[in-house]
């Protein structure tokens, strides 16, 4: 992608024009180019560019795009420090002010660079920071598949990979993109090994709490397979997660014994109870195609007058599909999502698909025999 230049002249003259412009705006910079070459000129121009950020947006973008265009023609080994310096200025300058301009400038730099240049990591992290500061994360690319590709293309170290994913996670949370944030956190935790899983203790703890707090999250068994989460075995947070994965209303006893712990997590008991009732109902619906109102009252610890309202709310989550039979005071289940999906569920899925395959073959053979007659 080409980046618009400040003026269509040689690099040296362009640097001189930039120096003169910045000088005219009050910057402490010489109008004469440095004898050290273009990269030294750019270092001094970037250092003094604060003054132009105060100008009209169109002028600023033109000037800064000129800086970007000069940066992009430097040798890669001379680019990195200068790009880091420019990014730092754009992230920190009057933090919170003129976010759309700063995003545009960083985006121009990011998309103007070679796709495999490792220093794009710095620019992308800066984009995330600025977008998060103004609630504009939707205006930058955050799709997990694309981020994975960049991590590979840039050949990031493990530390930088973790930094990027953690930064992206926090930005998505701040911008209330909970579904995307959860996927990024799972990606982050999944990137740890047994050797460094202990380093992700805080992230694992945060991931569990956010998942339990999310009103639209009901399946948690995948979290138990993550190495940093396994590292928390024996702690209350892991016990709580295990209850939400497969237990019924064992949560009630856990809460009675650990009320202060639940409160310290910022979790609300009533919301936890509502979620546990739904999870318990999902488990019941997997095992039974018909469930009496009396059984539901007993298992879910709800009153007779609350059964129908509970079922309606459960169906709205799309985790359970069922009908209410008021005459016989029962619920007829057509489908329920499994709370855990292990070897047994994979076998059931295989058997179902295999049965469909055999039935389709029978239909095919029947049609072929009819066409032959």
UniProtKB/Swiss-Prot annotation:
Family membership: Belongs to the eIF-3 subunit M family.
Keywords for this protein: Acetylation, Cytoplasm, Initiation factor, Phosphoprotein, Protein biosynthesis
Record-listed Phosphoserine modification sites: 2, 152, 366
UniProt signal peptide: none
Keyword Acetylation attached: yes
Record-listed N6-acetyllysine modification sites: 253
Cited SUPFAM superfamilies: ARM repeat, Winged helix' DNA-binding domain
Protein name (record): Eukaryotic translation initiation factor 3 subunit M
Pfam families membership: eIF3m_C_helix (PF18005), PCI (PF01399)
Subunit structure: Component of the eukaryotic translation initiation factor 3 (eIF-3) complex, which is composed of 13 subunits: EIF3A, EIF3B, EIF3C, EIF3D, EIF3E, EIF3F, EIF3G, EIF3H, EIF3I, EIF3J, EIF3K, EIF3L and EIF3M. The eIF-3 complex appears to include 3 stable modules: module A is composed of EIF3A, EIF3B, EIF3G and EIF3I; module B is composed of EIF3F, EIF3H, and EIF3M; and module C is composed of EIF3C, EIF3D, EIF3E, EIF3K and EIF3L. EIF3C of module C binds EIF3B of module A and EIF3H of module B, thereby linking the three modules. EIF3J is a labile subunit that binds to the eIF-3 complex via EIF3B.
N-acetylserine: modified positions: 2
Superkingdom of the source species: Eukaryota
Phosphoprotein is among the record's keywords: yes
GO CC terms, sorted: eukaryotic 43S preinitiation complex; eukaryotic 48S preinitiation complex; eukaryotic translation initiation factor 3 complex; eukaryotic translation initiation factor 3 complex, eIF3m
Transmembrane segments: none
Gene Ontology terms for molecular function: translation initiation factor activity
Taxon lineage: Eukaryota, Metazoa, Chordata, Craniata, Vertebrata
Domain named PCI: residues: 180-338
Localization annotation: Cytoplasm
This protein's encoding gene: EIF3M
Biological role: Component of the eukaryotic translation initiation factor 3 (eIF-3) complex, which is required for several steps in the initiation of protein synthesis. The eIF-3 complex associates with the 40S ribosome and facilitates the recruitment of eIF-1, eIF-1A, eIF-2:GTP:methionyl-tRNAi and eIF-5 to form the 43S pre-initiation complex (43S PIC). The eIF-3 complex stimulates mRNA recruitment to the 43S PIC and scanning of the mRNA for AUG recognition.
First-listed, main subcellular location of the protein, grouped into a coarse class: cytoplasm
Any one GO biological process: cytoplasmic translational initiation
